[in-house]
A protein has these predicted regions:
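Hydrophobic anchor residue at the start of the ABC signature
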Residues: 144, 386
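Conserved ABC ATPase signature
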Residues: 130-134, 372-379
Length: 403
């Protein structure tokens, strides 16, 4: 087989929106082939066509030598697919999720354990924990294990590292490179330029069209004005000598487990202060205490001059908070989410109306104003979650792994 994937003239429209326009490319066996492009470029639609979940309007595609329309059952047997939102059953345990996916393909965990062993062993200590309670990095590893459990010939990964910490992101790509050495073909969509370099070849897709296919370095060179634009600038922070946050010996325990252990630090007004650490290090727990959402079990701290233990309601009025899971209401429209959160922060209807279109235009979401949030790509949800966190112009903004 010269090519394990062959795509010729594939087009797909949703109403008046053309998601893919005459897409053509081929993937060699054993290759890591990358798709890079902005949100809404057509990456997810292309993956759904290749994994036989959506029919193309025009063109032809083959995976593992099989036509995606005529031989979809055989392709589903030979392909593994990890969608952008991790298709896990949140109320099932880690072990139950893996067993379920193995059963779908008429196999067992034991039969193919050797293939997923290195990945699954990292989350096996939590095998009885519900998937919905896992960190982003753990969900990622479980989703990859589920996609591999039937021993596929090719793996489709739709932005698999979005929303996880840098340590987990690196670990994930190390796992993919090891799978490549074992002969697995991998097609991965990624929004991160540094991940491009792990691919053998890259296809740059924009507005539903393949703009170019080449090695990562050549794609970066060819499209440098788009992928690495010049002329970006930022305002120098106006850091003052006063402290916006002061923490001393802050501790949080859940039963016998210590999530945050006597941390102390200070953040000046106007400063950008970062937490760096792996999943489970305590970053989210620390942020939730600082935002007045969780009571500390020891130590003390102030945010915007208010005590986080006794004046947490005042703290909430001075801050903006963007949680790791983007606390948006999926069944509300974009503008309805903004209105809801702005109202919670005490803004008047007049203020909200005057500001909504301006903010959406700045974020490039004005045309999506009346779109249900559940229909938005992950990157657009990210923009919306950020906008509702800063809409009321807080003094301090907390961002929990926003990218």
């Amino acid at each position: 087989m010269d090519y394990i994937v062959s795509v010729k003239g594939v087009s797909k429209s949703y109403g008046e929106v053309q998601a893919l326009k005459d897409v053509c490319f081929e993937v060699k066996p054993g290759e890591i082939f990358g798709l890079i492009g902005p949100d809404g470029a057509g990456k997810t639609t292309l993956f759904r066509i290749l994994t036989t979940l959506v029919l193309a309007d025009e063109g032809k595609a083959e995976v593992c030598g099989q036509d995606v329309v005529k031989n979809y059952k055989e392709i589903r047997r030979q392909a593994g697919y990890m969608p952008g939102r991790f298709s896990l059953y949140q109320d099932l345990s880690v072990e139950e999720n893996l067993t379920f996916f193995a059963t779908l393909f008429n196999t067992t965990i034991r039969e193919n354990y050797a293939l997923v062993k290195d990945i699954y062993q990292q989350i096996e200590p939590f095998k009885h924990r519900r998937a919905g309670k896992l960190s982003g990095g753990m969900k990622q590893k479980l989703a990859l294990s589920c996609a591999l459990i039937h021993r596929p010939s090719i793996l489709f990964l739709d932005e698999p590292t979005t929303g996880v910490d840098p340590v987990s992101r690196k670990e994930f790509w190390d796992m993919l490179l090891k799978l490549k050495q074992e002969g697995l073909t991998i097609i991965a969509a990624t929004p991160y330029l540094n991940e491009m370099k792990c691919c053998d070849r890259i296809a740059f897709i924009r507005e539903g069209k393949i703009q170019g296919i080449d090695t990562p370095d050549r794609i970066l060179q060819q499209f440098s004005s788009i992928l690495s634009p010049e002329g970006l600038s930022f305002n120098e922070p106006q850091v003052t000598g006063r402290y916006a946050i002061e923490v001393e010996g802050l501790t949080k325990q859940f039963g016998n487990f210590t999530a945050v252990d006597h941390i102390s630090f200070k953040v000046k007004q106007g400063e950008i202060f970062g937490f760096l650490g792996a999943n489970g290090a305590g970053k989210t727990t620390a942020m939730r205490m600082l935002c007045g959402l969780s009571q500390p079990t020891g130590g003390k701290g102030t945010v915007a001059g208010f005590d986080i233990a006794t004046q947490y309601e005042q703290v909430k009025k001075k801050i903006g908070y963007m949680s790791q899971k983007f606390s948006l209401y999926e069944d509300l429209k974009v503008w309805e989410n903004i209105r809801l959160y702005a109202g919670i922060y005490g803004m008047s209807d007049k203020e909200i109306a005057e500001k909504t279109n301006k903010v959406l235009e700045q974020l490039g979401l004005l045309n999506e104003k009346n779109t249900l949030v559940r229909s938005l790509p992950l990157g657009w949800k990210q923009k919306l979650a950020f906008s509702v966190a800063i809409f009321h112009e807080p003094k301090i903004v907390f961002l929990d792994e926003p990218t």
